[in-house]
Amino acid sequence: MRAKDFLNELVVAAYRLKGGYVTIPVRGQSIAISVDHLRTLKRAKTYSVKEPDTLDWLDSFEPGSCYFDIGANIGQYSLYPAKKFGDKISVYAFEPQSNNYYALNKNIYLNGLGENILSYCVAVSGKSEFSKLYIPKFIPGGNRSQFGREDIENMKISATHVQGMFGVTLD
């Protein structure tokens, strides 16, 4: 086992002893994030500082707003507005990568937001079709997956896993 893999397993095991998640304060909201991999822990720890403009935009929602989180990953930017605004807004989270979709739903559950966020394991695309999802890092919290074709320029590395996927338009 590589040292990096061993460290990952050790950190995840330590968090499992503490319930399997970390609670992060984000602009006055206490949000639980499942720790199934070092990547999800990193996403949790950088949550409130990585995309301040996104959080500013989410803060601007008003009652009756409808939010589509396309490429929701593990759900950080679905959880925050759902927690802040509750049933005053509608949140729809779309995440095609199976590891992330599992983590997204786990985070929805940990935060008691099952009535506030509807999640869908589909790729939002320019057309509705069956195709493949090319995944460069098949880990919870992984990103840069590409639907329909392997795009090395955007993925940065070749796919380590290819997953069957249905793509949908939101028209």
Regions found by a protein language model. Name each.
Residues 1-118, 153-160, 164-166:
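S-adenosyl-L-methionine
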Residues 40, 140-141:
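Short, acidic Gly/Pro/Ser/Thr-rich loop/turn segments
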Residues 73, 77, 125, 144:
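Gly/Ser/Thr-rich beta-alpha loop segments that engage phosphate groups in nucleotides
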Residues 102, 130, 142-144:
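Generic domain-boundary/flexible-linker signal
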Residues 123-126, 169:
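Conserved acidic residues
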Residues 128-130, 164-167:
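Conserved sequence/structural motifs within the catalytic ATP-binding
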Residues 130-138:
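Polar, low-complexity loop segments and adjacent catalytic/binding residues used for recognizing
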Residues 141-156:
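Short, flexible, basic/aromatic active-site loop/helix in glycosyltransferases
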